[in-house]
């Protein structure tokens, strides 16, 4: 079962496609999601250790909702990835494991956010350009030569099941820069 697979793993990273907060902020977009904080311990019980927030719905309850979501994830015993008090914090690689090698997660949203004014000094999800991601991967590889670098990219288009030529090209550039997966 998926449950036994997750429990047999030291680390399980999942994409959390909604804010998990009691905060309700008015946002103007087509689909607005929100989950209850009480649901998070269930994810932890089923083996989830890290939750990616660099996606197009983590900001669905505004900036306060995003920050609260990070706190709720921590309270439930998991680690949030890909969001922060500002872009610098949101884009910071997260150390997943130290043994036998360092494993780093680098997360970024690669889609435009609907009706959201992106302000890099305010709470946000990581939303870096490919060139910025390439530089981040190269810097990480240069400082930690024997590590594994996992990229968590939220990209693609709804109901399309194949990568676009541009996504394939970008993926190859990131691999060439030093990303492992």
Across the structure, where does each feature detected by a protein language model lie?
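Acidic, metal/ion-coordinating pockets
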Residues: 1-181
């Amino acid at each position: 079962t998926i449950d036994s697979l997750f429990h047999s793993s030291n680390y399980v990273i999942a994409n959390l496609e909604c804010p998990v907060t009691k905060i309700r902020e008015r946002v103007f977009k087509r689909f607005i999601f929100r989950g209850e904080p009480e649901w998070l311990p269930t994810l932890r019980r089923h083996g989830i250790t890290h939750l990616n927030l660099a996606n197009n719905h983590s900001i669905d309850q505004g900036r306060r909702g995003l920050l609260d979501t990070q706190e709720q994830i921590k309270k439930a015993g998991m680690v949030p990835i890909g969001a922060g008090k500002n872009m610098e914090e949101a884009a910071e690689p997260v150390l997943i494991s130290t043994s036998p090698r360092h494993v780093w997660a680098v997360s970024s949203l690669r889609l435009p956010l609907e009706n959201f004014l992106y302000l890099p000094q305010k709470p946000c999800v990581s939303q870096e350009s490919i060139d910025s991601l390439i530089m981040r991967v190269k810097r990480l590889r240069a400082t930690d030569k024997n590590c594994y670098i996992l990229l968590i990219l939220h990209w693609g288009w709804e109901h399309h099941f194949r990568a676009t030529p541009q996504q394939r090209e970008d993926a190859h550039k990131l691999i060439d820069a030093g990303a492992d997966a």
